[in-house]
Amino acid sequence: MGESIVKVEKLSHRYSVQWAVRDINFEITKNGIYGLLGSNGAGKSTIMNIMCGVLKQTEGKVYIQGVDLAENPVDAKRHIGFLPQKPPLNMDLTVEEYLNFTANLRWIPAAEVSRAVKAVMGRCDITHFRKRLIRNLSGGYQQRIGIAQAIIHNPKFVVLDEPTNGLDPNQIVEIRHLIQEI
């Protein structure tokens, strides 16, 4: 087995009186592509939101690169890239403005922001749209921007919650290729 990136132990989460997930255990190792499968309402997004520090677990532990997410969330989150079901895009910004803003949120030193933005735009094939408002781009390109914000800080672990949802067949193929590259 490879190097452990994420370790989840006895993870449980309850919404009011209803358990969404109960006693979940798994480990994610370096260089793997993993998926959470299950029916609607099975708790997949709940698990991802907990692993990314968006939601606090009711019970159990999550370790990111050996760091306990509950005890040291800032340090653990430095290793995580996250694209939620609904990408957190600011439609009133250009692609470049948005990624500059995101880079500052992701602990990238000011002197390196420009380089990081250019690099991630190249990786996600969105450089030619850098001066365009996000709201004027197709769903596929908006999804690429969402992925770009998730990987701009070169995280060890990337979580993509339904990254191809709502895209046409050609866009789905493009996004799958992009995911394989990252």
Residue positions per predicted region:
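Catalytic Walker B motif of ABC-type/P-loop ATPase nucleotide-binding domains
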Residues: 158-161
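Conserved catalytic motifs of ABC-family nucleotide-binding domains
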Residues: 154
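Conserved ABC transporter NBD signature motif
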Residues: 60-68, 76
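Conserved ABC ATPase "signature" region
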Residues: 100, 104, 111-129, 180
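Conserved ABC ATPase signature
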Residues: 133-137
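Helical segment within the ABC ATPase nucleotide-binding domain
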Residues: 173-182
